[in-house]
Amino acid sequence: MLLLLKIEDMTVSFGKGTPDEHKVFEHFDFTVEKGEFVSIVGSNGSGKTTLLNLISGSLIPDSGRILFENRDISRQKEYKRARYIGRVFQDPQKGSCADLTILENMALADSKNRPFGLTPAVSKKRIKHYQELLSQCAMGLENRLGTKVGTLSGGQRQALALVIANMTDIDLLLLDEHTAALDPKSSQTVMELTEKLIREKQITTLMVTHNLRFAVEYGTRLVMMHEGRCVRDLSGAEKANTDIDALLDVFNDISIECGN
């Protein structure tokens, strides 16, 4: 397979130059191939969300390189990376504008890569296209285009955020615990929608999750992080033969090794 993302010798510190300086990553290496769906698990503070922040451009590394399709994007602005990297956050409120309608949010997202961010008048053809996209959610959102997004439930809003993140032709999708704030039923619904969109559009995806069942059941690769390191990296038959109990055993072993 072709390499999409390569992180080389990356070091990242918080509180640099202060008594509270903390290195999250030190000489960290990581690669992602095109078409992979990588589930990332790990304890709090292991570097999972920091990794997504570095890839999206909301955080710049102290040293090292981030290569995207062999282009060095280490210092590229976040808004420029947003043209080819989509992201869905844990908080459903971050993926859409509450005061705008579903239609207005989708039209805004649709104009993301247009010159000067111009938003053209929405034609009947585009409205039909939006309805087709929303019908995948199986929540009836396609019939509520005039509804203010702020009135939607968390699950509905997160499903909308997923659709919006995939409206333009992105090369990489980042999911940052995107089901964590939802009730169990909504969480399962959004996860099934996630898998459907990724499979149909063949989008390379990194999904940070605390849900070990989702990490085991979904994706083509499973990475476990601890203290800025990848301590497990499973794919193929190795991932297929892994279960939740096996992952919990690894977590327990790590805790014992670290004296926790």
What are the residue ranges of the model-derived segments?
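The feature captures the beta-strand-to-loop junction immediately N-terminal to the Walker
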Residues: 41-43
